[in-house]
Curated annotation (Swiss-Prot):
It is an enzyme of class 5 (isomerase). PROSITE patterns: FKBP_PPIASE (PS50059). It comes from Saccharopolyspora erythraea (strain ATCC 11635 / DSM 40517 / JCM 4748 / NBRC 13426 / NCIMB 8594 / NRRL 2338). This is Trigger factor. Its main location: cytoplasm. Pfam families: FKBP_C, Trigger_C, Trigger_N. Residues 426-435 have a biased composition (Acidic residues).
Length: 467
C-alpha cells in the first residue's frame, strides 16, 4: 500500500492511498463468503457456492463493492497510523479509482491537530483573591446549623419572608389545565427560591385559607416558555424558632462541648473551602493567561461538531421544539443571532483549550492511571445519580470512555502548568502551589469524610430530638 499526505491548511490534510489487489485477497475471501450466504443457487448449500459460480450469477460488481466497503476504512486507518498526522473527527472519503485486478485508489480529507507552540510556563503570572474568613461568614454557617435544629410552630398572622407554609397549586395556560402543575399540601419556605417565579410575592401577606393568583413564565415541561396563570391556596403558616447559641447547642449540633470549639471548627472548614477555591481560581486564571499567549488554528469541522452538541443540549429541555426555544430566548432578552454567536464563541474556546492541553500533555508525557480514571468515573456517576457500573456501560455505548480519559489527561496537564506558573495573592505574596495542590486532594477527601461524619451525627441528633 502507498500513501501520501497533502497539507491543505494548518488543520486539514488530504491522504491519498493506493491499495494493490494482491493485498486484498483476505477481503475477497470474506466478500465471497458473505455474498454466498445471501444467494440461493440450486445444487449448492448456502455459503458453499464457489467464487466463479457466484460471480457468474451476481456479477463482479457486488463483489468489488463488498471489498471496497470493507477494505477502505481499514486501509485509511493504516495510512493514518503510518503517517505523523493526528486526525480529529471523521474523514470525508472518496474512492477515485477501481482498476479490477490491479489497484484501488481513494482520498480522505480530515481535520488534524495543528502544530502549536506553547510558552515557557514559568513566564505565566496571575493574581488570585486572598484567603480570608470573616466573622460574617462564620455567623452565616452558624445560622445554617441553627436552622437545621430549629423548630416550627404555627402562627396566626399573614405569611412573611422565611415562613414555612403548606399550599395547594394549580395552573392554566391559554385556559387549559397544566396537569404537572397540580399539587396539594406542598411544603415551602417563602424566599427559598425553590418554586416558580412570583410565588413569594403572592404568598407574602396572605392569610391562612386565602387564595391568590399570579402570572409566571414556565421554564420546564410541555409548556416551557409560556405564560401561565397560577392559583395558590395558603393552607397553613409556621415560623421557625432557632435554638440559642450556647454550649448546650454546640453539644447537640456537633461533636464539640463548647461554642468556642464549634466556631473554631466552622472557621477552619471555611478556610479549607476558600483555599480550594483559591486553587481553582489559580487554575482558571492560568488557563486564560495561557490561551491568550498561544496561537491556535481551529479545525472548522471540529468546531462545528462542538457547536452542534451545545445547540442540542440547549434545545433538549424544550423537546427540540425550535419555536418554544425561540420564545424562551426572547423572554431571556436574547436574540437567536446572539445565541448563535455566543455558542460559537464558547465552542471555539472549548476546542482551543482542548488542543492546547493535548499539546502540553504530549510534551509533558502525561499519563492517566487506572485509579485516576476510576476516580473520575465514580465522581461522574455520583453527579448523574447512577452507579459506576451503569455509568461505564452508558459511556461505552455512547463511545465516551475515550473522552473521559482525555478529560482526565487534560486536567493533569493543566495542573502541571499551574504548578510552574507564578501565582500571587492580592498583596503580591507568591503562593506555594506545591503546598496548595499537593494537599488539595487529601483535603477534599478529608473534608468529605468529615462532612459525612458531621452530617450523620447531626442528623441522628435531630432525629432523636424529634422523637
Amino acid at each position: 500500500m502507498k500513501s501520501t499526505v497533502e497539507h491543505l491548511s494548518p488543520t486539514r490534510v488530504r491522504i491519498n492511498v493506493e491499495v494493490p489487489f494482491d493485498e486484498l485477497k483476505p477481503n475477497f475471501d470474506r466478500a465471497y463468503k458473505a455474498l454466498a450466504q445471501q444467494v440461493r443457487i440450486p445444487g449448492f448449500r448456502p455459503g458453499k457456492v464457489p467464487a466463479r459460480v457466484l460471480e457468474s450469477r451476481i456479477g463482479r460488481g457486488p463483489v468489488l463493492d463488498e471489498v471496497v466497503n470493507e477494505s477502505v476504512p481499514a486501509k485509511y486507518l493504516e495510512a493514518v497510523n503510518s503517517s505523523e498526522v493526528r486526525t480529529l473527527g471523521r474523514p470525508d472519503i472518496e474512492v477515485t479509482k477501481i482498476e479490477d485486478g490491479d489497484v484501488i485508489e481513494f482520498k480522505a480529507e480530515v481535520d488534524v491537530r495543528p502544530e502549536i507552540t506553547v510558552p515557557a510556563f514559568g513566564e505565566l503570572k496571575v493574581s488570585v483573591d486572598d484567603v480570608e474568613v470573616t466573622e460574617e461568614e462564620v455567623n452565616e454557617q452558624l445560622d445554617e446549623l441553627r436552622a437545621r435544629f430549629g423548630t416550627l410552630a404555627g402562627v396566626e398572622r399573614p405569611a412573611q419572608q422565611g415562613d414555612f407554609v403548606s399550599i395547594d397549586l394549580s395552573a392554566t395556560v391559554d385556559g387549559q389545565e397544566v396537569e404537572e402543575a397540580q399539587t396539594s399540601g406542598l411544603s415551602y419556605e417563602i424566599g427559598s427560591g425553590q418554586l416558580i417565579d412570583g410565588i413569594d410575592e403572592a404568598l407574602i401577606g396572605a392569610s391562612e385559607g386565602e387564595t391568590r393568583t399570579f402570572t409566571t413564565n414556565l421554564v420546564a415541561g410541555e409548556h416551557a416558555g409560556k405564560d401561565a396563570e397560577v392559583t395558590v391556596k395558603l393552607n397553613s403558616v409556621k415560623e421557625r424558632h432557632l435554638p440559642e447559641v450556647d454550649d448546650e447547642f454546640a453539644q447537640m449540633a456537633s461533636e464539640f462541648d463548647s461554642v468556642d470549639e464549634l466556631l473554631s471548627d466552622l472557621r477552619e472548614r471555611l478556610g479549607r473551602v476558600k483555599r480550594m477555591q483559591q486553587g481553582m481560581q489559580a487554575r482558571d486564571k492560568v488557563l486564560e493567561a495561557l490561551l491568550e499567549t498561544v496561537e491556535v488554528p481551529l479545525p472548522e469541522k471540529v468546531v462545528e461538531s462542538e457547536i452542534d452538541v451545545r445547540k442540542h443540549d440547549a434545545i433538549h429541555p424544550f423537546d427540540h421544539d425550535e419555536d418554544r426555544f425561540g420564545e424562551w430566548l426572547e423572554q431571556q432578552g436574547q436574540t437567536r443571532e446572539q445565541f448563535e454567536d455566543e455558542t460559537r464563541e464558547e465552542a471555539e474556546k472549548a476546542v482551543r483549550t482542548q488542543l492546547v492541553l493535548d499539546t502540553i500533555a504530549d510534551a509533558e508525557d502525561v499519563s492517566v492511571s487506572d485509579n485516576e480514571l476510576t476516580e473520575r468515573i465514580i465522581y461522574q456517576a455520583q453527579r448523574f445519580g447512577v452507579s459506576p457500573d451503569q455509568y461505564v456501560q452508558q459511556a461505552q455505548q455512547s463511545g465516551q470512555l475515550g473522552a473521559i480519559y482525555a478529560d482526565v489527561r487534560r486536567s493533569k496537564a493543566l495542573f502541571s502548568v499551574v504548578r510552574q506558573a507564578t501565582v500571587t495573592d492580592e498583596e503580591g505574596n507568591e503562593l506555594d502551589l506545591d503546598e496548595l495542590f499537593g494537599t488539595q486532594a487529601g483535603e477534599e477527601q478529608g473534608e468529605q469524610a468529615e462532612g459525612t461524619e458531621a452530617t450523620d451525627e447531626q442528623s441522628a441528633k435531630a432525629d432523636a430530638k424529634a422523637e
